[in-house]
Amino acid sequence: MKMIKSYIPRVAAVNDLSGFGKVSLTEAIPIMSAMGVEVCPLPTSVLSTHTYKFTDYTFLDMTEEMRRIIAHWQSLGLHFDAVYSGYMGSAEQIGIISEYISFLKKNGECTPLTVIDPVLGDNVLSDAETVYYDRMSGLIGAMRKYVALADVITPNLTEACLLLDEDYPHESISEDRLTSMLKRLSALGPERVAVTSVMADKNKMVVGVYDKTLDRVSLIDCGYIDRPFHGTGDIFASVLTGALVKGKDMISASNIAVDFIKCAIAETLKHPEIPIEHGVLFENILSDFFAKNK
């Protein structure tokens, strides 16, 4: 099969598309583009807004269209340097992308990096049970099998607990327990793991990173601000993916992602009138940040 050549790194971004609210694909596309990465979106659903704090939003399931998009891409011989997936609305969608990843690994010029953000629940520390229960039937089990295909996974702490089938730590988590979780998540399949939104103590949040090849655990200090910033998990996964396909190692890529989020939050805090659900002001910092972090 003739392959369509990529002149810069090319990523298939599998996620939902919300018209308003800066989340998922509306973050992945501009962020990775600013990093010098070609982004090919494969929407799992299309919404008028994201679902946090908005009501009466529209929702279009894209399951059947996903099959048609993939079939067309296959006919074109599209090659991807990475597949990055986020929100999956059903076990069926997970199955569709699992098959496509297997196809790319078998038929591509090289094996694409597979980055999976296993979206299963909101990491809301005041109410750790805020999970998408209306869509959970069979999804957690399917996600556990799905992450076995990944090179990299980026769950938040809630999602890490769901994947490992253990209780969420309502207080801060010890370094020993976090290290154990990172290694057990890697045992599910991925060589590299980043767990986000981890409270190391009451005034400190970290990202826990594990690289199985190096058998190395790193804790990246994120600081702590006592309010949520919607969409930062998607930003982390997007920057991480972009940095990895540009040749950065896992620890360096994770540090770049955390630094970008810190800068975006600092920019957002200059405008306290902006509602939380409108997302963070990452647009103002894109050019300067990635010019300095190539």
Where are these regions (language model features)?
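Conserved phosphate/ATP/ADP-binding segment of small-molecule kinases
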Residues: T130-V217, I225
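Short pre-catalytic strand/loop immediately N-terminal to key active-site residues, enriched for Gly-Thr
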Residues: G19, V217-G231
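Short phosphate-binding/catalytic loops that engage adenosine nucleotides
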Residues: V37, P190, K248
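Charged C-terminal helix
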Residues: I251-K294
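Phosphate-handling active-site elements
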Residues: R216-S218, A243-A257
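Short, small-residue alpha-helix embedded
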Residues: L162, R227-M250
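Conserved N-terminal subdomain of the carbohydrate kinase-like
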Residues: K2-I116, L120-T130, F282-S287, K292
